[in-house]
Amino acid sequence: MTGKKRSASSSRWLQEHFSDKYVQQAQKKGLRSRAWFKLDEIQQSDKLFKPGMTVVDLGAAPGGWSQYVVTQIGGKGRIIACDLLPMDPIVGVDFLQGDFRDELVMKALLERVGDSKVQVVMSDMAPNMSGTPAVDIPRAMYLVELALEMCRDVLAPGGSFVVKVFQGEGFDEYLREIRSLFTKVKVRKPDSSRARSREVYIVATGRKP
């Protein structure tokens, strides 16, 4: 019985996924994921990326955000990306495969950043979802806290942070924490984000010294 329900649910998800206009556009444009459009919307409203910037991309695979940012920062820019999953190479992207929660992976990532002045940290990280908010939300909040810790370590004064967050327990406290570190903070729900999803994007600019 459970198997049948799961099968029906999977079928509905696949039908929704492939009929999604952003999925279709991504396929036509040869993009790695529909996430490309989310970041494009954020860039149109918040102008985060400029030529020559150094950007850290957390939760990068399959590469939609890195693929987008390469077009914005140009050949003199640099992207340092990390994900637990493998990612096909992108010119201009230094990719590290590993679990961001692992201290050794974090250390390796910081070594790759080195003395670079990072202007943007972006995180599209999400845990494997169980479908139970009481389990999923704390897991997701742990990841976004780690992303904010990365900001504290590498983000230059005046820099920006964009992070996917799932609304639920801990969201308001996290938002307050970000407001204490940045001069301007917005919560965005891009049109390309599925309406039924709890996800929103916090866009924080002007990191305080």
From Swiss-Prot:
Transmembrane segments: none annotated. Disruption phenotype: Cells lacking this gene show a dramatically altered ribosome profile, a severe growth disadvantage, and a temperature-sensitive phenotype. These effects are overcome by overexpressing either of 2 small GTPases, ObgE/CgtA or EngA. Keywords: Cytoplasm, Methyltransferase, rRNA processing, S-adenosyl-L-methionine, Stress response, Transferase. The keyword Protein biosynthesis does not apply. GO terms for biological process: ribosomal large subunit assembly; RNA methylation; rRNA processing. Its EC number is 2.1.1.166. Induction: By heat shock. Its cofactor is Mg(2+). Changing residue 38 to A: Loss of activity. Almost no change in S-adenosyl-L-methionine binding. One of its GO terms (cellular component) is cytosol. One of its GO terms (molecular function) is rRNA (uridine-2'-O-)-methyltransferase activity. InterPro entries: RNA_methyltr_RlmE, RNA_MeTrfase_FtsJ_dom, rRNA-MeTfrase_E, rRNA_MeTrfase_gammaproteobac, SAM-dependent_MTases_sf. Gene3D superfamilies: Vaccinia Virus protein VP39 (3.40.50.150). It is found in: Cytoplasm. The active site is at 164 (proton acceptor). Optimum temperature is 55 degrees Celsius. The keyword rRNA processing applies. It is an enzyme of class 2 (transferase). It comes from the Bacteria. S-adenosyl-L-methionine binds at residues 63, 65, 83, 99, 124. PANTHER family: RIBOSOMAL RNA METHYLTRANSFERASE (PTHR10920), RRNA METHYLTRANSFERASE 2, MITOCHONDRIAL (PTHR10920:SF18). Belongs to the methyltransferase superfamily. RlmE family. Specifically methylates the uridine in position 2552 of 23S rRNA at the 2'-O position of the ribose in the fully assembled 50S ribosomal subunit. This is Ribosomal RNA large subunit methyltransferase E. The lineage of its organism: Bacteria, Pseudomonadati, Pseudomonadota, Gammaproteobacteria, Enterobacterales.
